[in-house]
């Protein structure tokens, strides 16, 4: 029904907006000096960048074919499944408990900065005002609009099928364990 579609659209928009809000909060005092080289990053950050690499290729193809609905769906799935339900959940302790100059925290924030740029530029043709507001909030000193930015150029070093397969196994195991824990909680 029409009402269900509206609720679905509202919920998906809220998820994307909340992802941007989370990134803005986690990057509030980010300094470019924190950026850490890919080769020094922990494996989970390399996995996220591999996912960014794969998604970036799809987004470019969808853009060339004017498939905005596919862009929205792919970015939504990435934010919901890969980021909110997995990466953000795992890395929240690193963000808030690790020392400010630790490799893990700096790696995480480097990746979050890349994610912010990617998500804003990928969604800017679709969520014009939301991405512009987020962009201006993060880039206070910059006068250029997100609408004048190009997509973030994913590094070919990030392409790693072996890592992708390994983390798919880890994610599936984590999901099974989480489901069992939830089942036991419900049972009391």
Regions found by a protein language model. Give the residues of each.
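Short helix-adjacent coil turns
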Residues: 63-70
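Short runs of predominantly hydrophobic/aromatic residues within well-ordered alpha helices
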Residues: 13, 20, 72, 76, ...
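Residue-level signal for short amphipathic helical patches enriched in basic/charged
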Residues: 66, 78, 82, 126-129, ...
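Acidic, turn-prone loop/beta-hairpin segments
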Residues: 30-57, 88-180, 184-187
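Single conserved hydrophobic/aromatic residue that forms the stacking wall/gate
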Residues: 1-9
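Core structural elements
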Residues: 12-24, 43-55, 73-95
């Amino acid at each position: 029904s029409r009402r269900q579609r509206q609720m679905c659209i509202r919920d998906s928009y809220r998820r994307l907006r909340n992802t941007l809000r989370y990134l803005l909060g986690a990057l509030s005092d980010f300094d470019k000096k924190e950026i850490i080289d890919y080769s020094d990053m922990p494996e989970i950050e390399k996995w996220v960048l591999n996912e960014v690499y794969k998604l970036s290729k799809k987004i470019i193809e969808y853009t060339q074919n004017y498939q905005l609905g596919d862009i929205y769906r792919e970015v939504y799935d990435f934010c919901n499944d890969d980021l909110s339900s997995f990466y953000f959940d795992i890395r929240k302790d690193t963000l808030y408990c690790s020392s400010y100059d630790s490799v893990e925290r700096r790696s995480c924030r480097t990746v979050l900065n890349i994610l912010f740029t990617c998500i804003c530029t990928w969604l800017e043709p679709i969520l014009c005002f939301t991405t512009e507001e987020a962009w201006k909030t993060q880039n206070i000193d910059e006068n250029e609009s997100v609408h004048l930015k190009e997509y973030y150029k994913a590094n070919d070093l990030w392409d790693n099928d072996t890592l992708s397969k390994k983390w798919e196994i880890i994610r599936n195991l984590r999901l099974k364990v989480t489901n069992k824990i939830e089942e036991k909680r419900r049972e009391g």
